[in-house]
């Protein structure tokens, strides 16, 4: 093949697509503003470098609504290192920097979500993939912005639900990942108006699981589970410029632990579906997991598991000579997960 082929990824004469050009311009302008380079200096530029200070607040701005979050990471632009085809001279592989792209944003947030964020997550679980614009904001103790990362056309890639554990005293947080088409780092823009409603902390021990026909009263632990988005890259303009197009959702298995003495209904289900081969849709079940307030009387969030099917049942390992409650682990496949807000 001719080494001067215009489609060669390392060709210096290759013209970037319009999307890539705008992305580069956005990265450069935003970076200049953020780090106080000439002609882009702002009063908050120096403070922007302190966004990782201990005790600073992290927030998500979504359609004008400012949402406090526990933590946020990623999103800053980076480039891949591209290897050129081997050449006899010089005797080592040449490398160059590829086009910039934005990293995924990873965010820990409260399971009891404000309206804008709840709708985004709910739509994603219903396979209604909506792209959002917004910003990730870092402030100091007084809610003065230290930095702002503006994102465009972001789509959710993962929704991670925390584990539920009766013996735990720790709070649980939802983990969200979303992929922006491009991001722009900016300096802070002043003081953030703090949300009027406070975020509700949810302890991991406050939950209620219900599966019709099964005794779930002694379920001591539900393992964390994550819904993942599959993507199909779509070329825009030149072959170097790709946009992620949402494909299908990958729903996880549901795994839980309960006392052996209360596992009889689960084992009967396991016998029917697995040992006797009654594995049709008529043997599947629907389950609900309710996240409860501190009084254990008000539902804050309901997670529904559709088309559950048991495929594994077995005792947990117990060390010899220990006086512990014997427990079993149960695993079920799940075809769809949805969420709905409670009344709390």
Where are these regions (language model features)?
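N-terminal secretory signal peptides
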Residues: 1-20, 29, 35, 40-46
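Flexible domain-boundary/linker segments
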Residues: 31, 38-39, 124, 273
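Glycine-rich, low-complexity intrinsically disordered segments
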Residues: 48-344
């Amino acid at each position: 093949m001719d080494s001067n082929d215009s489609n060669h990824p390392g060709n210096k004469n290759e013209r970037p697509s319009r999307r890539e050009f705008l992305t580069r311009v956005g990265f450069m302008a935003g970076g200049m503003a953020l780090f106080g380079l000439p002609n882009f200096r702002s009063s908050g530029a120096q403070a922007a470098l302190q966004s990782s200070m201990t005790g600073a607040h992290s927030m998500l701005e979504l359609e004008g609504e400012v949402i406090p979050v526990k933590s946020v990471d990623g999103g800053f632009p980076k480039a891949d290192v591209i290897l050129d085809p081997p050449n006899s001279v010089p005797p080592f592989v040449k490398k160059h920097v590829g086009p910039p792209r934005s990293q995924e944003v990873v965010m820990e947030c409260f399971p009891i979500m404000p309206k804008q964020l709840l709708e985004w997550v709910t739509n994603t679980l219903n396979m209604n993939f909506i792209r959002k614009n917004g910003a990730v904001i870092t402030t100091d103790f007084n809610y003065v912005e230290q930095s702002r990362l503006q994102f465009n056309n972001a789509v959710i890639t993962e929704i991670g639900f925390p584990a539920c554990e009766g013996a735990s005293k720790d709070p649980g947080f939802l983990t969200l990942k979303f992929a922006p088409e491009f991001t722009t780092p900016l300096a802070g823009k002043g003081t953030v108006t703090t949300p009027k409603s406070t975020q509700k902390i949810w302890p991991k021990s406050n939950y209620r699981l219900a599966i019709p026909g099964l005794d779930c009263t002694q379920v001591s632990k539900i393992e964390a589970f994550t819904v993942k988005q599959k993507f199909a890259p779509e070329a825009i303009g030149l072959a170097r410029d790709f946009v992620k197009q949402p494909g299908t959702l990958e729903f996880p298995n549901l795994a839980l632990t309960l006392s052996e003495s209360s596992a009889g209904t689960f084992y009967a289900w396991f016998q029917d579906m697995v040992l006797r081969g009654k594995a049709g849709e008529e043997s599947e079940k629907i389950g609900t997991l309710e996240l409860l307030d501190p009084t254990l009387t008000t539902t804050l969030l309901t997670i529904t598991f559709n088309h559950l099917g048991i495929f594994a049942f077995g005792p947990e390992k117990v060390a010899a000579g220990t006086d512990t409650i014997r427990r079993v682990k149960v695993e079920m496949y799940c075809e769809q997960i949805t969420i709905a807000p409670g009344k709390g």
